Amino acid sequence: MELEQQMNRRKFLSTATSTLGALGIPARHAAASEPTPTTPEQHPSRPNVLILMSDQHKRSCMGVAGDPIAATPNLDRLARESVRFTDAYCTNPVCAPSRASILTGLYSHHLESRGNSKPFAPKHKTIADHFNRAGYLTAMIGKMHFVDAQTHGFNYKLEFNDWWQYLGPKAQLYADELGRPNSGAGMPQIDTLWENNDPWSGLRRPDGRLSSVAVGRASEIAEADHFDNFVARESIRFLEDYARPNEPFLLISSFLKPHDPFMPAQRFAEMFHPEQMQLSPTWGKADLEHLPAEVRTSIRDCRWTPELKIAAEARKRMAFYYGCLAQMDDCAGQVLNALARLGLDRNTIVVYTSDHGEMLGDLGLWNKFEFYEGSCGVPLSIKVPGHAPAECSAPVSLVSLTATLAELSAVPLVAPVDGKSFAHLARDPASPLPHGPVFAEYALGEPEAKYMIREGDYKYTYWVHDIAELYDLRNDPRETTNLAARPEYRATVERLQRALFAWHRPAELAAESVHTTSPPAT
């Protein structure tokens, strides 16, 4: 059986290479890595795994989360069939570092992944490496922001460059549309498609400085040609062509939306109107005096898009965000429907999550980069066949997703991970087994470096060069009152800071340096 399975895998890789060639897609994207598999007899009912992933989805922007505007029927349906984790967090509120943690189960400081331009080293194993070794066929279709395209471990991979080639001459139209208001939202640097070989050309003022990102508008690109639609089609094709009994697969279908620029296809742009939008209750009401300087500056200047200080422009941006979200939901629904049509849903663990959130006007902030709930919180639904749906309010981290899925699939880990499995919660949210605090980090080694711990009702953020933040999420879910400087919370601050430093002590600090509300003396 092992020999037969290896032959089937070789047949797949050969077929994939031929198919890619017919599409005009380079064969190098079907990586011919030959794992040493376990046999199906060892795990006759080993489940498939499908991970649906989006980019910049604010956790609260779902119908199932109580948002009256969000058009997310497919993700809502999945959430109602799953254990929905209401308090899930990313490890780093920016694309590439967060995705690296999801893929590897390691924190950013171990990966040395400091931003969108630094790849993690090939020595780090990914979720694909673990599942490959267990005999799974592993595929990644869509955005993963690898930076270095070889550090992934997947047998089969289609991403931005493959989509560009699918677009053919229309790629220039998309590059022009994207280049006017934004850098490319994590697109590969195909320099010849950008004006003056500059992916930031749409943001350049005459003096060379960067200007603002556009508020949003309807895309000029046909709906079928959008990246998310490409991801949905290719994911369905993978399921139709390569899903086999007793040959389990791990498929990550990773969508770009609702990441900015907020340019949904025409019909989704028309679904929402600025007049419908309700600005965040904290928009324009932040308590600036008790916030770190970096946050105050972002609120005051409305970084990248100063127009958003105007209520009408803020509502317009929200409408286009919801349009992008609706388009992504539609694409995710196509994949889920195909899974059911093919009868694969009965033995497939299905996950939905996002790499980080979007502030969407909370506290007057937009985009990501923050540890506030809108930015660092992520949606997370895990559907395990045979287990009842429920909600789970225990804080969990995406760094633990690899370990969790490995345990749920009886897949041995081939390398250590930082994340601790919460499979017990995915099976039974009422499980009495403990699951530790959640940690996050941002801008390692930079002046704005900060670290976060969420434990119980409290979230504590340590800024290396600024004042600390402490929020009681039970009584202050919108994070309007920073408690860190209040004497009655000193013990709470010190307890959380000790736990945070036990997890990771920033290199910028002296060994004995501990502070509560202000940076250490220099």
PLM features per residue range, with description:
Residues 2-463, 468, 477-505, 511, ...:
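Formylglycine-dependent sulfatase
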